[in-house]
Amino acid sequence: MIVADSECHSEIKGYLPFTRGGVAGPETREEHREGQARRGSRGPSAFIPVEEILREGAESLEQHLGLEALMSSGRVDNLAVVMGLHPDYLSSFWRLHYLLLHTDGPLASSWRHYIAIMAAARHQCSYLVGSHMTEFLQTGGDPEWLLGLHRAPEKLRKLSEVNKLLAHRPWLITKEHIQALLKTGEHSWSLAELIQALVLLTHCHSLASFVFGCGILPEGDAEGSPASQAPSPPSEQGTPPSGDPLNNSGGFEAARDVEALMERMRQLQESLLRDEGASQEEMENRFELEKSESLLVTPSADILEPSPHPDILCFVEDPAFGYEDFTRRGTQAPPTFRAQDYTWEDHGYSLIQRLYPEGGQLLDEKFQVACSLTYNTIAMHSGVDTSMLRRAIWNYIHCVFGIRYDDYDYGEVNQLLERNLKIYIKTVACYPEKTTRRMYNLFWRHFRHSEKVHVNLLLLEARMQAALLYALRAITRYMT
C-alpha cells in the first residue's frame, strides 16, 4: 500500500496532469490519456471528481514520490492518491504504516497482515481486506487461514474480542481483557506483541473510516462501486461526482453558510479575548448536553444496513456487535473518560514509548501533524485561523467516544459544526460502512474537496487516539 518505485511513477501519472511549464517530453499528454483510459473517468474516489484531485493534489503528491520510493516497491494505490491531497500528512502516515507492517517487530509480517484483515473486516471494508489478503500471502502466510478465523491459530483468535471492542465500543476494554491475553499459557501474548497488535488494530479501524469517508475505489474497478459495501440511495447510483462545488451545493445558500460560519468563529474568538468563557460547571453541563444530543445525530433511516459479504464475514466473530451511543436513554452509561486523567501526552505516549518506542515516536508525530495541519483557508476565504474549527471537530469525535476535555467549552461544537457535518462525522467515525455519497455532498457544500479530505484526516486520527487511550489505560491498570 502507498508505494512508489520506477514503474509506479508512470502509473500514478495516469492520475497526474501533464507536467506544467513544458518540462515533460512530448508524449506526456498522451501518457496521461492512456492512464485515464486504464482507470476510466471515475478516478480514485467515488465522491471526489478526478479533476479536483488533478487540480489540487497532483503536483504536491508527485513531489513526494521520491520519499515513498525509498520505503519499498510496488504501486501507488487510490488511498495514497486521495491522501496525497495533504502530502505532509501522507508522509507522516506512511512512516507509521510502513513501521507497523513492513519492518522487523515482535510479530511476524504475515501475522500483522492477518490482524489487519481482522480489523478491516469489523467494518466490512473490502478495500483493506483485499489489500492485506494479498500481502498476507506475499509474506508467506498460510492460505488456509484465509478461509476464515476458525482456520487461524488460537492465539490470533483470542485477539478477536479486543478487536471487536476497539472497533465499536472501546470504552468497554478493561484490564481483565488485557490479562486474558497475557496470562501464561501455550497461546499467550507477550506485552511487546500485544502493544504492536493494538496499535495495528486501531490503525486499521481508523483507516477503514478514511476509506469509506472518502469513497475510495478499488484500483482495478474504475467502473465499480466504492470500496465500501454500503448501499447508496438509488439517486446516487451511477452518477459521477461533480467537479463544480456549486452543482450540489445550493449555490448562494451554501456561500451564505460559509459567511455565517466565519461570523460565528469571529464572535467566539472575540468572546475569548474578552475572557467571557463559561464556568467549569457550565462547561461540564454543555458536554453532557452535547453527549445527549449526539443520540439524535444518526444517518437517515432509509439507509439500509450493509449486508456483510461471506468472504469478509468469515473473519468476524459476533457480527451483530456494533457501535452503541456512549449515552443511551434508559441505560446506565459508563463513566465519562476525563481526558485530563489519562492524556496521550502525559500517559499514553510515555507508556507506548517504553513498550514500543519506534511506534510511539511516529504515532506522536502523526497526531501532531494531523492536529496542526492547516492552510489558513475556509472555502473561498484565505488568511483564516482554523484552529477553533479543527479543535471542535476533534473534540466532537472524542465526545461520541465518551471522552471529555475539562478545559473545552462544548458550546463551540454546536456553534461551529452544522448538523449535516455532525451526521457525517459520527457515521464515518462510528459506523463507516454506512457512509454514502449523499452524506459527503451535504456537509460543507461550498468547500473544496481537499478540505473535506482534511476532515477525514482529523476523523482518522481522533478516532485512533480515542481507541488507543482506552486500550493503553487498560494496560496501565493491568500493570499497576
From Swiss-Prot:
InterPro entries: AhpD-like, Sestrin. Residues 66-239 are annotated as: N-terminal domain. Residues 308-480 are annotated as: C-terminal domain. The keyword Signal does not apply. GO terms for molecular function: GDP-dissociation inhibitor activity; L-leucine binding; peroxidase activity; PH domain binding; protein sequestering activity; protein-containing complex binding; sulfiredoxin activity. It is found in: Cytoplasm. Disruption phenotype: Sesn2 knockout mice are fully viable and do not display any overt developmental abnormalities. When kept on high fat diet, they display higher insulin resistance and glucose intolerance. The oxidative stress induced by acute lipogenesis upon refeeding results in increased liver damages in the Sesn2 knockout mice. Any condition, like obesity, that triggers chronic or acute endoplasmic reticulum stresses have the same consequences in these mice and can lead to liver fibrosis. Sesn2 and Sesn3 double knockout mice display insulin resistance and glucose intolerance. GO terms for biological process: cellular oxidant detoxification; cellular response to amino acid stimulus; cellular response to glucose starvation; cellular response to L-leucine; cellular response to leucine starvation; cellular response to oxidative stress; D-glucose import; DNA damage response, signal transduction by p53 class mediator. There is a cross-link at K175 (Glycyl lysine isopeptide (Lys-Gly) (interchain with G-Cter in ubiquitin)). Keywords: Acetylation, Cytoplasm, Isopeptide bond, Oxidoreductase, Phosphoprotein, Ubl conjugation. Gene3D superfamilies: AhpD-like. The modification Phosphoserine is found at S249. It catalyses: a hydroperoxide + L-cysteinyl-[protein] = S-hydroxy-L-cysteinyl-[protein] + an alcohol. It is an enzyme of class 1 (oxidoreductase). Residues 20-43, 221-251, 272-291 are annotated as: Disordered. Induction: Up-regulated by treatments inducing endoplasmic reticulum stress. Functions as an intracellular leucine sensor that negatively regulates the mTORC1 signaling pathway through the GATOR complex. In absence of leucine, binds the GATOR subcomplex GATOR2 and prevents mTORC1 signaling. Binding of leucine to SESN2 disrupts its interaction with GATOR2 thereby activating the TORC1 signaling pathway. This stress-inducible metabolic regulator also plays a role in protection against oxidative and genotoxic stresses. May negatively regulate protein translation in response to endoplasmic reticulum stress, via mTORC1. The N-terminal domain has an alkylhydroperoxide reductase activity. Belongs to the sestrin family. Interacts with the GATOR2 complex which is composed of MIOS, SEC13, SEH1L, WDR24 and WDR59; the interaction is negatively regulated by leucine. Conveys leucine availability via direct interaction with SEH1L and WDR24 components of the GATOR2 complex. Interacts with RRAGA, RRAGB, RRAGC and RRAGD; may function as a guanine nucleotide dissociation inhibitor for RRAGs and regulate them. May interact with the TORC2 complex. Interacts with KEAP1, RBX1, SQSTM and ULK1; to regulate the degradation of KEAP1. This is Sestrin-2.
